[in-house]
């Protein structure tokens, strides 16, 4: 008898707790018809990372916090937009694959097609953030704002930058001033074009820069201020990924003194359908390396794009293959992958990368 009473008591307590939780949830995420709707796709990374100490900013586990907790940590967001959080993956961005990025792009395409969705935010690890951002910039043709955001400090750190970055990203995605600007990268109050923005430092907060192209704007008190009217980067094109099920393998080879020229052959034999060379200087490659590249182009009709290992620079058309011009190796790689997927010939790819 007493056991039955105790069981009933426990049941009632749990029922009350569930009701309280449901009430709290409904209060914490109210819908405001006057606010824009923003969908946040979560991919993991440092912004969702946790460490054992609030002083630890190096040794932590990325992708430890779910999208719900990330949103809850920034209550001011609900005054800016109605948020719909979607967990796509939850890992360090070094482990993301082209398949993951293709999946994300298709999810975003479906989301921006909804008339009630104003903008998109993607939380992402910073290690490969620029690659995902570039892919989205080349495949999502919409005027709606798409903002990729990350953090350099885990969520557990003193002075964690993730919450403010996320708040600013939602503010940018909610603003009509962000319309028609392509995919944007937002960290440390700066707004950059995905086409040009790159990570320049492995540790500091002010790591994402656009070098010669410059920032598009800044965020002050959750309001974006743009320096220019919306414009399309020179050389930017859109690829239709609706029928693409799998992206071809494209490898990046790094130039250095005494490089092994056979590495290019190995990459092709292991399945690479294209190569991007992070060449020395303005597309310098070793003589014996160029002999191998020439043979691969002749025998396999494989596209080879010459980029540069320098932080800035212009890859000229003096190289043996296709110059990437201002695109760094990692950005050129995704453009080449999409071109191959779309059936581009080598001549088409040359025209794609050229700056008229």
Swiss-Prot record:
Localization recorded for this chain is: Secreted, Cell wall
Query: Which GO cellular component terms are attached?
Result: cell surface; extracellular region; periplasmic space
Top class in the EC scheme: hydrolase
Its predominant location is secreted
Question: What are the protein's GO molecular function terms?
Answer: asparaginase activity
Question: Which keywords annotate this record?
Answer: Cell wall, Glycoprotein, Hydrolase, Secreted, Signal
- Alphabetized Gene3D superfamilies for the sequence: 3.40.50.40, L-asparaginase, N-terminal domain
Residues that bind substrate, according to the entry? 93, 126-127
Q: Active site annotated at which positions?
A: 46
The record's Pfam families line, in alphabetical order, gives: Asparaginase (PF00710), Asparaginase_C (PF17763)
Q: Does the keyword Coiled coil apply?
A: no
Q: Which residues are glycosylated?
A: 37, 52, 176
Q: Supply the PROSITE patterns for this chain.
A: ASN_GLN_ASE_3
- Reactions accelerated catalytically: L-asparagine + H2O = L-aspartate + NH4(+)
Q: Which residues form the Asparaginase/glutaminase domain?
A: 36-356
Which BP terms in the Gene Ontology apply to this protein? asparagine catabolic process
**What residue stretch is flagged as signal peptide?**
1-22
Matching NCBIfam families: asnASE_II
Record's protein name: Probable L-asparaginase 2
